[in-house]
Amino acid sequence: MQSYIKNFESSWFAAVMGTGVLAVTSLFYSEYLPILKDISFLLFYFNILLFFVFLMLWILRWVKYPKNMIAELKHPVLSSFSPTVAVAMLVLGIDFILIKNNLFLGKIFWVFGAIGMFLFSLIVPFYMFKSESIKLDHVNPGWYIPPVGLIVIPIAGSLIMPHLTGVWHELTVLINYFGWGAGFFLYLALLAVVIYRFILHHPLPSAMAPTVWINLGPIGAGIVALINMVNNSPFITIKEPFYIFSFIFWGFGLWWSLMAIIMTLYYVKKLKLPYAMSWWAFIFPLGVYIASTHLVYKIFGFEIVDYIGFGLYWLLFFFWIVTLIKTINKVYSGELFKDKIN
């Protein structure tokens, strides 16, 4: 049990993020296949269990092995996955609101997730900015996770805004627009850095190959958050320009989806693709992009857009099942809990 606690990395919460977004997209596409609504509820309850098991291990690791946790925060690659605990809370907040219609618990998860994400969005970049050991080898799409977490804040936060008044409403509006603004422009800056690495450096190591899908995270989350903010902000009287930007941004995401598929096939054929926890990077980014696809369809009414989303949904479901099975096998063998940070 001690090895499980000692080597429990924050990146495990990516499983909660992925399962949560699969639950939401299952609910969305239950319009086509009603049984998906039941699957959505099953995934929701399974995800709650996952989260609290992981949260217990995460807290125990802070108590028993604080040096390991601090080392993770300072690591040029692993540090980017530290915010996943906060993003997982934000995703559960979304699930409670959309799947269970439970605004109260949705608010609680959103508040803790937003606070955690605010802290991580400062801590992780701070350590990176002052580090003198970061190299081009360390650059990878996992660096998008802190910006993605900020962008996820207004997804649930915008759904909460109409239910608040006075200073609490104003504070929530401020938090939502801060999250989207800070996250989106940090993503644009990091996009240039990551593309630079892709073009002028050697390919990602096979264990990090699935992170190419993380590019879809800020795109999908950015679209969903922007649409939610616009729809729930009475002071925005002309909404069409934001909708059009969302559609354009969605097109960029479609290109990334195709590129991610091509790159994954390349890694499978040329470099192999051994299982690693990074496989969970397949899930959340693709899932949130699928959610954005459904929202774009709802706004513009282009059925072909929703058909694309429904097709990608089954790819998402396939990724989730394979990754879950592989993860369970590796947990059983103990391979995922070997010492990595000393």
From Swiss-Prot:
CDD domains: TDT_like_3 (cd09321). One of its GO terms (cellular component) is plasma membrane. It comes from Methanocaldococcus jannaschii (strain ATCC 43067 / DSM 2661 / JAL-1 / JCM 10045 / NBRC 100440). This is Uncharacterized transporter MJ0762. Gene3D superfamilies: Voltage-dependent anion channel. It is a multi-pass membrane protein. GO terms for molecular function: sulfite transmembrane transporter activity. The chain crosses the membrane at residues 8-28, 39-59, 79-99, 108-128, 142-162, 175-195, 207-227, 242-262, 276-296, 304-324. Disulfide bonds: none annotated. Belongs to the tellurite-resistance/dicarboxylate transporter (TDT) family. The keyword NADP does not apply. One of its GO terms (biological process) is sulfite transmembrane transport. InterPro entries: SLAC1/Mae1/Ssu1/TehA, Sulfite_efflux_TDT, TehA/Mae1, Voltage-dep_anion_channel_sf. It is found in: Cell membrane. The lineage of its organism: Archaea, Methanobacteriati, Methanobacteriota, Methanomada group, Methanococci. Pfam families: SLAC1. NCBIfam families: tdt. Keywords: Cell membrane, Membrane, Transmembrane, Transmembrane helix, Transport.
